[in-house]
From Swiss-Prot:
UniProt name for this protein: D(4) dopamine receptor
Gene coding for it: DRD4
Extracellular side: 1-32, 89-104, 171-186, 308-316
Membrane-spanning parts: 33-55, 66-88, 105-126, 147-170, 187-208, 285-307, 317-339
Glycosylated position list: N3
Cytoplasmic side: 56-65, 127-146, 209-284, 340-357
Source organism of this protein record: Mustela putorius furo (European domestic ferret)
Lineage: Eukaryota, Metazoa, Chordata, Craniata, Vertebrata
């Protein structure tokens, strides 16, 4: 990997360079300060509530929600370690007023936490695909070990992607100390591909295969249910007692906590069926989480890699700043998504708010 300086580019990563704002005391600086404080507060409150809810409520302790807690942890670290310095830089008009070493640490944390978010979403898609493709094998090995292993791998890989920044890669000749950004164009391309452009298609393909498998299983199950229903006699007279139909139990989607159940579950399987229902609810929210992530982060990575691949292209600093803000807003969206689309999260959130207020 080369070490070509990007000093002639305006803020390849987060727009933290001169010209991104109006300077301290300007209306733009005031808006950045108010927006930044609100964003940090929303990210901290929402994601802390997600972690506490899963830890305190047994109904939320499902394999999918283990990954959601890991995702919330990445957002919490972003709000604690990255956003305060980013907001301060925006308030100062994009001028970096701290040491280059702190800038490198900020860039590394920024890359690692964004990468951890997308890798966690990829890990969820891989876990769901295995649960649907080979459910019997998955159930024999269930118990949280696989999920914890995947979560550990996502964080190790994320740290590996970000590590070069802390190993001197960002120390380019002619570096402007008033600008905090990634200085090596080759690394910008490498990190963009590893953090976004490579994992996103893999994740979407796995989700497509997972939900396609679920639809096939549901269709086969409905066919089996229909075939087992007793037929009514063709002649007159009331049907015999055994032919009287009873309301059918709600259908369950196969998940890691239950094998592919038969249409009629015996009493001993009731608890397993309930866990299946919980996991189904957890899976329902995932496409919305993935969609929100792609909407918020795709513009950032497109602008990010364009500035690296096309040095002659003038990427306006304000555009870089705007897409960076949009990406960070995603960290506050996930708790809102869980509240809207998951009744169990909603109930626990209400309970927690009643205790606090």
């Amino acid at each position: 990997m080369g070490n070509r300086s990007a000093a002639d580019a305006d803020g390849l990563l987060a727009g933290r360079g001169p010209g991104t704002g109006g300077g301290a005391g300007s209306p733009g600086a005031a808006a950045a300060l108010v927006g930044g404080v609100l964003l940090i507060g929303a990210v901290l409150a929402g994601n802390a509530l997600v972690c506490v809810s899963v830890a305190a409520e047994r109904a939320l302790q499902t394999p999918t929600n283990y990954f959601i807690v890991s995702l919330a942890a990445a957002d919490l670290l972003l709000a604690l370690l990255v956003l305060p310095l980013f907001v301060y830089s925006e308030v100062q008009g994009g001028v970096w007023q701290f040491s280059p070493g702190l800038c490198d640490a900020l860039m590394a944390m920024d890359v690692m936490l964004c990468t951890a978010s997308i890798f966690n979403l990829c890990a969820i898609s891989a876990d769901r695909f295995v649960a649907v493709a080979v459910p019997l094998s998955y159930n024999r090995q269930s118990g949280g070990g696989r999920q914890l292993l995947l979560i550990g791998a996502t964080w190790l890989l994320s740290a590996a992607v970000a590590a070069p920044v802390l190993c001197g890669l960002n120390d380019a000749r002619g570096r402007d100390p008033a600008v905090c950004r990634l200085e090596d164009r080759d690394y910008v391309v490498y990190s963009s591909v590893c953090s976004f452009f490579l994992p996103c298609p893999v994740m979407l393909l796995l989700y497509w295969a997972t939900f396609r498998g679920l639809r096939r299983w549901e269709a086969a199950r409905r066919t089996k249910l229909h075939g087992r229903r007793p037929r009514r006699p063709s002649g007159p007279g009331p049907p015999p007692p055994e032919a009287v139909e009873t309301p059918e139990a709600p259908e369950a989607i196969p998940t890691p906590d239950a094998t592919l159940a038969e249409p009629a579950l015996p009493a001993s399987e009731e608890r397993r069926a309930k866990i299946t229902g919980r996991e189904r609810k957890a899976m329902r929210v995932l496409p919305v989480v993935v969609g929100a992530f792609l909407v918020c982060w795709t513009p950032f990575f497109v602008v990010h890699i364009t500035g690296a691949l096309c040095p002659a292209c003038a990427v306006p600093p304000r555009l870089v700043s705007a897409v960076t803000w949009l990406g960070y807003v995603n960290s506050a969206l996930n708790p809102l998504i869980y509240t809207v689309f998951n009744a169990e999260f909603r109930a626990v959130f209400r309970k927690a708010l009643r205790l606090c207020c």
